[in-house]
Amino acid sequence: MWLSCTAHALHDGYTDMIYALLPVWQTEFGLSYGALAILRGVYAGTMATLQLPAGRLARKFGTRATLAVGTLLAALGYAAAGISGTLLGLCVALAISGGGSSTQHPLASGAVSRVYGRNARGPLSIYNFSGDLGKSALPAAISLLITVMPWRHALWAVSIVGVLVAAVIALFLPSIPRGDSSMQKASRQHSNDSRSGFSLLFTIGVLDTAVRMGLLTFLPFLLKTKGISQSMTGTALALVFIGGAAGKFLCGWLGARVGVIGTVFATEGGTAALILAVIYLPLTPAMVLLPLLGAMLNGTSSVLYGTVPELTSVDRTERAFALFYTGTIASGALSPVVYGFLGDQIGVHGATIATAATALAVLPLALALRPHLRTT
């Protein structure tokens, strides 16, 4: 459980610290918003594409070996980014790192779900929370490091952390059971899988991710128009991610009381309202709202991930998680590109407003999902 959380924190931190590096790379390589979004898309796209193959590799070589090698590749990719001298070299390095990170979500979340069975919603919330810890720590750390050293040296420093985590996983991650009596019992209870329900959940996850990734792509530039400094950009992102971590716990509590649908309505509606507030408010009040925006922005995902086992049988858990993460990560890769080119056409403010509209599009889908959820 705790090694899965450690892996999640590292890989999510690696994924989201790209946002803090985008302004640096824009200056270094003279990139447009669309090109910056493509850089983010290279990492996320590679990660999404290799989710299902990572699951097959784990069945052949074991979860521990596959996750350890993937973590090592993610670290080495960032080390390679630190020595890249061209935009193409940077793209290749990010593809290597994204490929390594493809192992983490399906294997670590599947392991937690298998170990805890029907009681996995709570542990999965802790697992998701650990990812937000990484999202809070690494973007802030890289932003601080690039103020005291060249950005290339900063990447080498964070890659060393990944190498150490890979070694710990290889040495200490226990074998993951493929099934036991409690899992088999839960599997029988879930024998009537809701494919249409899973499809709706999948679509909601894709749109929710599009909102999150699209907004995070533009947030540094939106704040830059308000006069924020480079060092404070990392702090602003950390505020969003810290709020997101709190949102995981908040939505777990909220979901237990008002249900999945009520929670989704609260978080997506709140996200749309707060995005508009951050756009139009001055810098100081906008910064104050960032933790709450993060809670709304990331809170939905915790409820969605915990619902995946409810809509599939236990013997298909890892495949269901792989499919779900493939869709959400693919959305994370493609949506910033779409919003990025939209930003080139209509500006940062217009594209950011489009992310708020996407959040509102989730609401009718959530209503359609209601009949497919367990009432117990």
Question: Language-model features: where?
Answer:
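Interfacial helix-cap and linker-helix signal at transmembrane-aqueous boundaries
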Residues: 25-26, 57-58, 144-149, 223-224, ...
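A late C-terminal transmembrane helix in Major Facilitator Superfamily
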Residues: 135, 309-348
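Structural signature of the two symmetry-related core transmembrane helices
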Residues: 65-79, 262-276
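Helix-loop-helix hairpin linking two adjacent transmembrane segments in secondary transporters
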Residues: 127-175
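Helix-to-loop junctions at the C-terminal end of transmembrane segments
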Residues: 50-62, 247-259, 343-344
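Residue-level signature of mid-helix packing/kink "hotspots" within the transmembrane helices
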Residues: 16, 44-52, 136, 241-249, ...
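Cytoplasmic helix-loop-helix junction between adjacent transmembrane helices
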Residues: 93-131
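Extracytoplasmic gate region of multi-pass secondary transporters
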Residues: 18-19, 196-248
